[in-house]
Amino acid sequence: MSESRQKLHPLLVHVARSFGHFLVPRKPSCLLVAVSGGADSLALLYAAHELAPDFGVCACAVTVDHSLRAQEGALDARFVRALCARFSPPLPCFVQQISAGAVHACAKIRGRGVQDAARALRYKVFDHVAARCGAQVVLTAHTRDDQYETLLMRLFQGAAASALQGIRAARGRYVRPLLKVSRTCVEDFLQTRGVRWREDASNTCRKYVRNRIRHELIPALDAVLAGWRSGLDKTFAGISAEHSFCVAALTRWREGCSHAWEPVPRALGTRLRMPRSDFLAAEFILRFFLLQEACVRLGVSHRVPRGALERCARFDGVRRIHVSGLQLERAGAYVLFSCIHASDTARETKKQDAGSPPSSEKQGVSAIYVARPGAYPCACGTLLVEVRPAGVFVCCAQDHVGVGPFSFPFYIRTHRTGDTISIRGGHKGIRKMFSEWHVPLSDRTVLPMIEQDGVLRALYGAALGYQNRYAERTPHE
């Protein structure tokens, strides 16, 4: 790269360093740049176009219309294609459209929101286009601002140390050359070249946590504590070092354990097992890391809350734990670990009652139709439905008293946004009740509730060691 080009702009220098570090060893012939039309991705596209000849590679672009923003997504794609055509020589541009409704369908399956689903489908498109055009490396335009937003979001979500490593500069075929570049630097780079970019209206929507962090939290931090980024860098560097130490300790521990996480096939997927004595003898933090490893081996697709893994790590070797779709239980001399998907629960329920109506399941909510006594696998573990002289009661192995009475049929389900339950003098929101009881997020998503005739009749808190809340029927119900 020429000396004059180094002086043009700091962004170009950062990208050149990234290319030297990640591209030279791989010796790719083609780079695929993911471009949305926004400032970050356009800056990366221009930088890649300028630097590609110096590294002996060609560059091409891919842009994706997610079919989420009416005509705006199509206009973004058209803008990117026209811009690529103006380069000299013109850059090949692959315009891909995700079919209408596909993102929402994916979000329902993954249970992690529309933005997560859009990202998952977008990366599938990138992989497909990379294979089609022969690109060995895909460049994405994550910036230093994205890094801090991600770290803050994960920090407040109680993420594990592995997630607090932040966005990686490279993973597989994906390289992120702008991770040390600020958004201010990006915009300055484009302005020096007279390049205009498009703004995605969804980036200002406050319903998304990342946007609230970007537009509300970070400006507040800047106003109150100007050097917070430097302090955060040091904190996360320390976390990273401690995480590396724990990984090394786990490796040494595994060398002395000959049967760590053996697969055990079953009808509804695979479980993993290890000797109970080995698991219980491990330090708490090693158990935590073992469970993280097990989640990876089982291909758990949803983000598991840290609290859920910590609860499993406190397994006493006797009582089964079922939280956030994970299950840890004793099986003779072994402990069994499995991921219970909503689809698994639905299939089990279908087997128990082939004639039952469809579940009232909504996005993020599991619901089981109950029309007879028996054992029902739920998000918190197996619940027992018993017929007693006073009526039908729901209980579990840890709580034989249970909650009730009810009458058949009814649903056992998890929390739904807006849930309220009848109390003296009116109704009370379940979310407020969770806050008053100090229920962690990992338990809120699995605490069982009983719904009958469209009315929430009970919150069965005793299933996880909390109070019960039972709503008597009113005369006009």
UniProtKB/Swiss-Prot annotation:
Superkingdom of the organism of origin: Bacteria
One Pfam family cited in the UniProt record for this chain: ATP_bind_3
Catalytic activity from the UniProt record: cytidine(34) in tRNA(Ile2) + L-lysine + ATP = lysidine(34) in tRNA(Ile2) + AMP + diphosphate + H(+)
Main location: cytoplasm
Any one GO CC term of the record: cytoplasm
Record-linked HAMAP family: tRNA_Ile_lys_synt (MF_01161)
Annotated GO MF terms: ATP binding; tRNA(Ile)-lysidine synthase activity
Ligase listed as a keyword: yes
PANTHER family hit by this protein: TRNA(ILE)-LYSIDINE SYNTHASE-RELATED (PTHR43033:SF1)
GO biological process, one term: tRNA modification
Role played: Ligates lysine onto the cytidine present at position 34 of the AUA codon-specific tRNA(Ile) that contains the anticodon CAU, in an ATP-dependent manner. Cytidine is converted to lysidine, thus changing the amino acid specificity of the tRNA from methionine to isoleucine.
Domains (record comment): The N-terminal region contains the highly conserved SGGXDS motif, predicted to be a P-loop motif involved in ATP binding.
Classification of source organism: Bacteria, Pseudomonadati, Spirochaetota, Spirochaetia, Spirochaetales
Subcellular location: Cytoplasm
Name this protein carries in UniProt: tRNA(Ile)-lysidine synthase
Alphabetical list of InterPro entries matching this protein: Lysidine-tRNA-synth_C (IPR012796), Rossmann-like_a/b/a_fold (IPR014729), TilS/TtcA_N (IPR011063), tRNA_Ile_lys_synt (IPR012094), tRNA_Ile_lys_synt_N (IPR012795)
EC number: 6.3.4.19
Binding residues annotated for ATP, in chain numbering: 36-41
Recorded family membership: Belongs to the tRNA(Ile)-lysidine synthase family.
The entry's keywords: ATP-binding, Cytoplasm, Ligase, Nucleotide-binding, tRNA processing
